[in-house]
């Protein structure tokens, strides 16, 4: 994607921020990656089931918080559940700004929970700014971005990890959002 950071650099706690410096292509699957992917297909149903389980646990735990979560499963659709996207609001149900959102991310990192933002709108990246794009022309994209946080959601999370993430979210929300 022409990103300024590779995936490994973005795994450092609280270091979600990156820039897209040009509208380039991302293509990094090798034959080895494809072979690994084929092997993963054998456990794909288990992966989806575990993700769905974690999503349900998270969503049940956050009903009393000033957050809104992306719906993964309805009668009309179901998602792969690879991201748990949460939008942050204050006690008056007003969407928080990026400063508050980033403070939330930092406090979560201090508690040992790596969160992320999916995704920074393209007009905010250098490569697209150079092409004349301006985020002011995309107010809906900015509104979705400004208060969005993505929680850990992967099949290597055990139940204790999930409960710890919930505890950290509740603690951080009580300090910052309420």
Residue positions per predicted region:
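PLP-dependent aminotransferase class I/II
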Residues: 1-178
